[in-house]
Amino acid sequence: MSEKATEIANLLGPTVESLGLELLGVEYLPAPGGATLRLYIDVPLAEQPDRIINVDDCERVSREVSAQLDVEDPISGNYTLEVSSPGVDRPLFTLDQFARHVGESAKIVLKLAQDGRRRFQGQIVRIDTEAAAVVFSVDGKDVQIGFGNIDKARILPDWVALGLAPQKPNKPGPKKPGHDKKKPSNEPAAGKPRAE
């Protein structure tokens, strides 16, 4: 998270927790016409999977946080507030969140290139808490990436496990007229005499 996003997360976290929810992280996206402030919320880990985040939860957080932002005013200028569930491709904002998803695949974007790359995709192997780093298996090799160098990270959903993998058609689709692949022949059609 950016410094501004971290500041806002620290400010709003207790408000979200007071509603019985968890603030996973904040995205602050400044733009010339007005910034976007996106909050990702979820139910506490202890209540999963019995309870999931819903639209009512997002609306409650939006109302409470909006009022707090009006009073505290941490953002100058216009902005749009969005409150969202993390979704199946959930973003990861903290080392604890990476630790919850060890064994799953993720894609990450770095602030500064490492090994000539800024984008990596691989399986989360472990968290090195002493080094404040995440170890990924990328192309069969372990790669350690400092948490402070991670700009963005998202879980890659396992669509097969979710039962949402694209299905291959069992039979070919209908033929389009005029697209017959047979080559024209000078032979007469069977049973028809050739006109002389």
UniProtKB/Swiss-Prot annotation:
UniProt-listed InterPro entries: Ribosome_maturation_RimP, RimP_C, RimP_C_sf, RimP_N, RimP_N_sf
A GO-annotated cellular component: cytosol
Residue ranges of the region described as Disordered: 164-196
CDD domains associated with the record: YlxS_C
Basic residues composition-biased segments: 173-182
One biological process term in Gene Ontology: translation
Localization annotation: Cytoplasm
Keyword Cytoplasm in annotation: yes
Keywords carried by this UniProt record: Cytoplasm, Ribosome biogenesis
Similarity comment text for this entry: Belongs to the RimP family.
NCBIfam families for the chain: PRK00092.1-1, PRK00092.2-3
Main function: Required for maturation of 30S ribosomal subunits.
Protein name: Ribosome maturation factor RimP
Natural source organism: Xanthomonas campestris pv. campestris (strain 8004)
Upper lineage: Bacteria, Pseudomonadati, Pseudomonadota, Gammaproteobacteria, Lysobacterales
